Amino acid sequence: LAEAEIEYADDPCTTLFVKFPVRDDKGKLTPYAPLDKIFFVIWTTTPWTIPGNMAICVNAAFDYVLLQAPGGEVYILAKDLAENVCKAAHIDYTACKVLATLKGGEFELMTAGHPLFDRDSVILCGDHVTLDAGTGCVHTAPGFGADDFNICRAYDAAGKTHIGTPVPVNAKGVMTDEKYSGQFYAKANEVI
């Protein structure tokens, strides 16, 4: 078929912002705020892949802000996306305070707590991270995407990490992780 012969249908999807609490900041973030108040924030259109999250990717060359929201939580977001993220999350951007601006490369190999399980997600740098949409912090589940798999394997091959590749969904689209076991992946979006 020629491109002109293909009709695309809009497929509405669930989107989600997810906070990952910083666990190990390599001593770089605590001068600005207490560690228990700092979060990497990702945005995803595939919440059902969150159980497979093993990393968060940032772009080493981008500017990221530590944005303190009303209430005291501090969010790590790409500087160029911060205002849009606040608007989408119903946070008054004008009431927020930028505590610091850092290059994405400064976050490399920090860790954040997984939002659903007692394990860490490591922070990696990848050129596939863009400023087109989202937060500038990309949810990375190596069992669910080529970019995710390739960046995790590259870090493993370089001896920098030892990232697993969980695939908590079987060939029929049914969740296999015990917490969501038996649910069809699209239904798991609502629970996750």
Where are these regions (language model features)?
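Active-site cores that bind ATP or allylic diphosphates and position pyrophosphate for catalysis
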Residues: L1-V41, T49-I50
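Non-cofactor substrate-recognition interfaces
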Residues: L29-V41, P47-I192
